[in-house]
């Protein structure tokens, strides 16, 4: 698989590293990772750098992941780029909101590398 550029957005630096490690364990060895600690920071990264995949938490201060996703779509910052929400939010309402906002996948924390592989690799291959 060729180089994959991923943006990981989470207010926890530890969680960003866990997501990155899980992506590599899922088979994305040639991974270039851009990190953002908030939705607003994520938007700035997208304005400056092209990406192939976006993974975002929902619960973040100032701009939550759903608003981040809505802004990506409204500003046309990453057309066609799959977005996967990775979050502790597990209600069906949150899943529905994420899908309606444009998410292509949803992973509940805590998660395993196998779950990341099952949900992310098909999106990367299809992109």
Map each language-model feature to its residues:
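Short amphipathic alpha-helix used as the core "switch/output" element in two-component signaling
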Residues: 44, 66-79
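Active-site beta3 strand of CheY-like receiver
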Residues: 49-55
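Helix N-cap/capping motif at the beta->alpha junctions
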Residues: 35-44, 65
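Receiver (REC) domain active-site loop signature in two-component systems and cognate sites
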Residues: 60
């Amino acid at each position: 698989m060729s180089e994959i550029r991923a943006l990981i957005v989470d207010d926890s630096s530890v969680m960003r590293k866990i997501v990155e490690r899980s992506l590599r364990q899922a088979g994305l060895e040639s991974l270039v990772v851009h990190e953002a600690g908030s939705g607003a920071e994520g938007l700035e990264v997208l304005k400056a750098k092209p990406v192939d995949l976006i993974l975002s938490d929902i619960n973040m201060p100032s701009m939550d992941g759903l608003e981040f996703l809505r802004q990506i779509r409204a500003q046309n910052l990453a057309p066609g780029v799959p977005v996967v929400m990775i979050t502790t939010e597990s209600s069906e309402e949150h899943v529905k909101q994420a899908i309606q906002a444009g998410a292509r996948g949803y992973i509940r924390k805590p998660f395993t590398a196998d779950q990341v592989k099952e949900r992310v690799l098909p999106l990367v291959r299809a992109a």
